[in-house]
């Protein structure tokens, strides 16, 4: 990743090596670490986390968006979820964006969690969305 200081690269590497709760989204300490780093970078930071709580990929985007690269095929199928959740920061007070929802739908992510970061680098609010079983009335996700 170009343009990052060695200390920022080390912080991203530490995030990659962290274990996240398998059942919960994150701990308070993990939210603070992610929020502080995102604010210091001035960019969204995201983690793709598997169902066992292991970080599979660290993503660094721009201030207003994050790009998820092509993922390995693995557990794909029309009805199957990928077994990954996206935990990422938003530097604005917006909740989950339309882009976040489209990523979840098209990549078949288990869930998308947006952590809002205030100007001082504190996590202030989070919002989550997950896919609903096919055949559910209305939208294919719950926010």
What does each of the following model-derived ranges do?
Residues 24, 50, 94, 100-103, ...:
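Acidic-enriched, low-complexity/disordered segments with a strong bias for Aspartate over Glutamate
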Residues 1-2, 10, 105, 109-143:
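Divalent-metal-activated hydrolytic enzyme cores
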Residues 49-53, 91, 114-121:
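Short, flexible beta-strand-to-coil junctions
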Residues 1-78:
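Glycine-rich short-loop/terminal segments
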Residues 58-108:
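Short HxH-centered metal-ligating active-site micro-motif
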Residues 6, 21-22, 69-72, 93, ...:
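Proline-rich intrinsically disordered, low-complexity coils
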Residues 42-46, 82-84, 109-111:
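Short, surface-exposed beta-edge/turn micro-motifs
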